[in-house]
């Protein structure tokens, strides 16, 4: 069975950038409506056809594992500045069978994921939007090398 490291921007309590991940995933429309809160949120809609009718969506939450998916969470430096005050970059280890994704977005089953570590976003010092994403990429690479042997 293959596994992956999945990242999520969330509070220390596990609350993400969406008001209601479950409500979005259970949307009856072809695309999720993406009910935003006052906080920034991933702009791309996740196609519901990625789930079959038997999938229990109640345990699935949004995350990312690629640079392209990460850019849907942070659109500009102002988003990052807001997020860095209250949010952490959480790292989860998840078996591939509990991950559903397309090129722009990812959801994973939080009940089947193992929290590896949380990094305060305020400790990441970017100098511009592309630097933020590049720093994430560097963190991803470092974490992957140092943590996969411990999982």
Regions found by a protein language model. Give the residues of each.
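Conserved NAD+-utilizing ADP-ribose enzyme module
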Residues: 1-45, 55-59, 68-151
